[in-house]
Amino acid sequence: MEVNKLYNGDILDMFSKTPDNFIDLIVTSPPYNVGINYSDWDDTMSYDGFFQWVETWLKECYRTLKPDGRIAINIPYETNFQERGGRVFFTADFYAVMKKVGFNFFGMVDLNEPASNRSKSTAWGSWMSASGPHVCNVKECVLLGYKESHIKLNKGESQWEYEEKEVDGKSKKIYSQEDKDEFYELVFAEWKYFNDSRPLTTATFSEDIPSKAIKIFTYKDDVVLDCFMGSGTTALSAKKLGRNYIGFEISEEYHKISEKRIEDYDRLVRIEKKSKEFFDY
């Protein structure tokens, strides 16, 4: 398995080629099984069947993560499954499977999308009446887990730069206020994000989500995997932040989109580098 490469194929086939203890961070947003019309995936499995499938790939996530590896999974708090009588606490059931395969709980991030971007439909319940309203939490979260050690065993280069200054006769690391504010947001587990106004796939991953997870949970040059890569947002975020990336995607169409995004970014970097060299000359 090579790093900085995007693989087109079934998730379990791709995991079978991935070594044990190889990945530093898995950050992904899997199908929610809510009937989305994906090009190469049936998003209408039975509830129990869905979580049996989840268990198979979570076992592979656990196997391929390093002992101090982390996992960050973007899912909804609740979903609607008529076979279970309506709303179900999806996050709780998902975490139960994570725990079953061996993951330790590392926290849960509340994703804060501007209210103006949320659906205001009430077709799922009564309107202006106590008859049968459905109290519906449309927000999503990021479930966090770690494999064996919650502390990184091998230190690396941090995301945030600092100046070394002497304060009261002692050397102290001084960070910018902007970086400190960002760190506070990440550790207090309420991440602001904006969905792409021009989605490239059926369910495009907001770049805000993987970039925040990568910043807070990895060092530079760490290996980041997205096993449901979609349009390549996690890989692109990792590349921009100086990490190595791996992506799995079953859809040939989405795989091509993700490769083009990486190629376009590389082209832009080369152009900017040449422009800088020209003006510095």
Regions from the language model: what does each represent?
Residues 155-161, 269-279:
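Short, flexible loop/turn segments with low-complexity composition
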Residues 8-13, 275-281:
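Conserved SAM/SAH-binding loop
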Residues 1, 259-272:
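Short, conserved SAM-binding/catalytic segment
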Residues 1-257:
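Core catalytic lobe of class I
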